[in-house]
């Protein structure tokens, strides 16, 4: 009976991973709107790496998924006056990679795809397999938007929700 009691333990509830995705447009012109305070350290880092002068938040997406499962979110980016394009952000799985502090979240099969402002040509794409420290912001990638003057930058942060 004691052996059965030790073995017959209900499984621990699955953890959830919450991911916040920020889609930024970088350009050579100074920004006209202030970005959220939590993104300021990321912008400072980006200005140290690239020559862009202004950054604009195009959209923020929030996903919550059971650990080890896939998720996707779609939306519309407004690049400017009458310049909208749809996007999709998805990943195959997100799971806790380590229990240390800070914890690391592994994101496998990350894919981002967005239309261009003009609608001409192929879509903008990013694919990655990344590890993100819980609560920290990670720049996943940058891709040019119809030339070198503007870029689309994907920044994300993730945390475990227990």
Report the location of each language-model feature.
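Outer membrane pore-forming secretion/assembly proteins and partners of Gram-negative envelopes
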Residues: 1-162
